[in-house]
């Protein structure tokens, strides 16, 4: 769902970014990072607003942490299991596969730390953590589905949905002002209600 959102909402240079792509952090650091972050956050909120979707990574565990209707899952496995799976899927040597895994891990970790000043493996960011060393994909998926359908999880209230709308609009306005060359250190953007934007500046 998130990738569809990216295609729908992003284009041009920023649309090329992918949290998991090799070389991401190098490109990210040299390409107006705050504009990218604003648009990324806006897309996360817009996609989440539609409901019943799956967002993979991209800081969603941080951005949606205050919404009770968002269920955050971390799935991980041993390096050995990851190497075996990727080597078989992509036909790479074990040495090349290990280098690629290390590179992607560093890029994801670097992105998350830069964007949110947190470590993405912090267990407090997740509602469910699954180690797939002894579980196959279907079993792990079944655990996630069962938990997501639990009565313990709340559906998104109207207030939560409206908050996502306002946050998405706020981030888009913030990005547009940055793109126009405004000094955002002297500007405050507020969205008190859907469709209404207040911009305050200090001259």
Model-inferred region functions:
Residues 1-52, 92:
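ATP-dependent small-molecule kinase phosphotransfer cores
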